[in-house]
Amino acid sequence: MNRIKQTFAALAEQGRKGLIPFITAGDPDPAKTVEFMHALAAGGADVIELGVPFSDPMADGPVIQRSSERALARGVTLKSVLADVKRFRETDPKTPVVLMGYANPIERMGVDAFAAEAHAAGVDGVLVVDYPPEEAGVFAEKMRAAQIDPIFLLAPTSTDERIADVGKIASGYVYYVSLKGVTGAGNLDVSSIAGKIPAIKSRVPVPVGVGFGIRDAETARAVAEVSDAVVIGSRLVQLLESAAPEGAAAALKTFIAELRAALDGAGNTAR
């Protein structure tokens, strides 16, 4: 059983919900990425999503776009992100790490080479935003062969057929995008999310994490009531964008601890 599966199995046994924070590797300072990852874990993160910066992040809003631009300007690459994961693993062998990004950097490295290097670094899952599930069967097989979970997105516009396609190849968890549009946009409609989750869970045999639009403990708790996990990204990137460098890791840890407390107070209604 891999780290992601172990984590969600333990959460289910404890009646708790998963907390999955996202940060962009290398932003605002490449030398701080591993420290930030440890701060997230210490604050109570169950899984860490680490963004691989890309020059055309089409699914991301202005906040994460800016973070990608800053990281790229500082020389961050897919190889340097994998090196960060390897350094993180030296002192944290337990917290699952998922890389989130776009196909181009992986294809430039080569899918087979990426799978081997990601496995060696200690990556547990990969979410490629622009790999549609109906075209990702071979990619998913190669990831699983390297003991890496291929993770896919679903959205309010996903048809039953698309959900079923994802259910056939996803492992680890699926990421339900709670809003139409790009990351960091709009207001949450929890009742709409609650209406969609049963259709997903009836067709997808892995936990469902919900993200986009989650900004604080209140929205995290509300989403946790109807899902298996909460994903939060833009708010954390904003925090790092505005925090004083010397206090950024502590601010991350404090914010994640607040979300952790809120989620631990949420009911286990999604099971």
Curated annotation (Swiss-Prot):
InterPro entries (alphabetical): Aldolase_TIM, RibuloseP-bd_barrel, Trp_synthase_alpha_AS, Trp_synthase_suA
Gene Ontology MF annotations: tryptophan synthase activity
Record key words, sorted: Amino-acid biosynthesis, Aromatic amino acid biosynthesis, Lyase, Tryptophan biosynthesis
Residues of the active site: E49 (proton acceptor), D60 (proton acceptor)
Annotated metabolic or biological route of this protein: Amino-acid biosynthesis; L-tryptophan biosynthesis; L-tryptophan from chorismate: step 5/5
GO cellular component entries: cytosol
Entry's EC annotation: 4.2.1.20
Catalytic reaction annotation: (1S,2R)-1-C-(indol-3-yl)glycerol 3-phosphate + L-serine = D-glyceraldehyde 3-phosphate + L-tryptophan + H2O
Keyword Lyase: yes
Family the entry assigns: Belongs to the TrpA family.
PANTHER family membership: TRYPTOPHAN SYNTHASE ALPHA CHAIN, CHLOROPLASTIC, TRYPTOPHAN SYNTHASE, ALPHA CHAIN
Assembly mode: Tetramer of two alpha and two beta chains.
NCBIfam families: trpA
Function: The alpha subunit is responsible for the aldol cleavage of indoleglycerol phosphate to indole and glyceraldehyde 3-phosphate.
Name this protein carries in UniProt: Tryptophan synthase alpha chain
Designated gene of the protein: trpA
